[in-house]
Amino acid sequence: MEHTSKQPRVSSVRLREWYEHEKDFDKKGKTPQGESIDYRAYVHRTIRNFICFDWNLTSNTAMLQISQLPGRIRYRNVKTEFENCVKPWLEMSKFSLVDLHQAILNLCELERTGNGITRAHGFEIQSLQSRSISAKSGAGSVSVFGEDSVDSVFESMAEDGVGNLGNFYWLPRRGSIKEELRVVLVGSKNRVNFTAPSNEKIVRRIIADIRNHN
């Protein structure tokens, strides 16, 4: 645990291990009696998983960072595991979650009005009756917006719907973000995915943007 008078931080590093079937190393053989034997190869894999809870006492905001996990390990399980670990002295359930659903819609709308800080590569919106629509541009360098058919569907659905997913490229800005960075907002899981290694300054800038537009 690290802390200053304005910002405590709780970090954890955990070794995670699992076995994964690798077909390329499977073999076949026979018993002395001629019976077939199938040898299945399992590779012992390990990662060191970093988790950090950061609480800014000045703004009374916090964020939980989890390093990238392999597909078989669920982020929600790691989050619960960490919460249980610190629960005797830090009740994380007391913190309210940022509404990523609304942030997705607001960032898209900001772009559509010509004031965007992001470029949307794709989005998914769910209606009040649990029906969803999604759209995606043909390349990350092209906005999903710009055609009447897509724009009108977004406008209609966003009026009463919620943003389930936003696939954004954060645009370069003076003093913080030097080049485009793809960040995916998963509203249905309250999760922000950084798709490339990013330093703390960039992470904080993007999280602040999301807070400001939720």
Tell where the protein language model's regions lie, with residue ranges.
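Intrinsically disordered, low-complexity, charge-rich terminal extensions
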Residues: 1-214
